[in-house]
Amino acid sequence: MKLIVGLGNPGPKYAGHRHNIGFMALDRIAADHGFGAWKDKHQGSLSEGRFGSDRAVLLKPLTFMNNSGQSVQAAMRFYKLEPEDVIVLHDEIDLAPGKVKYKTGGGHAGHNGLRSIHAHIGPEYARVRLGVGHPGHKDRVPGYVLHDFAKADQDWLDDVLRGVSDGAPFLATTEAAKFSNAVALRVSPRRSGTGQKGKDKPPAPAKQQATATKAEPEPDTRSALQKLMERFK
């Protein structure tokens, strides 16, 4: 069984924030795959269900982002799970909008939700990094992630959420490559940092080969004496 965790902050005022893309992803998964009603358990909101024969639990910690690890640890203890059974979906400012990356282990890169999970269960869990882009300067990061997605983001955001939902059965079976492929089928290439679909550049036209050839000089049939006489004319 897998515990799939989406990170965010509870409450309507935070629902549309970039920081809450993990919550959004879990809501889409639960709706698309017929998971059970959300129930408040283990300091979070929890929904149980199956992807085929594979059982999974979806968890949205209600502890606020900075204490997400408390809820994750409580759910792990109840279901008797190991860190290797946990997959965390979270916002990632170091990825362009619309980019999705799967990884296992590693640092928290300053993400407070991951920092809390590290402190409670260690780093050996899987993550799905959901790119939201970077505001350009580190001082602007808090205001950026704690702000609603722009209207211009809605198209790529919907593609990402659909793609993650399409790939969710492969999260349950730890098939990272198949998960990534499912996402890629939904998410088309985008211009870095804009969240807009990029247009393929037309191939550069092939250089035309010159068809004209240089004229060959005619052979000089004069004798040496004739050439000498020509010089003194």
UniProtKB/Swiss-Prot annotation:
E.C. number(s) listed in UniProt: 3.1.1.29
Catalysed conversion reaction: an N-acyl-L-alpha-aminoacyl-tRNA + H2O = an N-acyl-L-amino acid + a tRNA + H(+)
Pfam families: Pept_tRNA_hydro
SUPFAM superfamilies hit by this protein: Peptidyl-tRNA hydrolase-like (SSF53178)
Site (Stabilizes the basic form of H active site to accept a proton) location in chain: D91
GO biological process: one example: protein quality control for misfolded or incompletely synthesized proteins
Zinc-finger found in the keyword field: no
Signal sequence, start to end: none
GO molecular-function term, one example from the UniProt record: peptidyl-tRNA hydrolase activity
Gene Ontology CC annotations of this record: cytoplasm
Residues at the catalytic site: H19
Description of how the protein assembles with itself and partners: Monomer.
Function: Hydrolyzes ribosome-free peptidyl-tRNAs (with 1 or more amino acids incorporated), which drop off the ribosome during protein synthesis, or as a result of ribosome stalling.
Family the entry assigns: Belongs to the PTH family.
HAMAP family: Pept_tRNA_hydro_bact
Protein name: Peptidyl-tRNA hydrolase
Gene designation per UniProt: pth
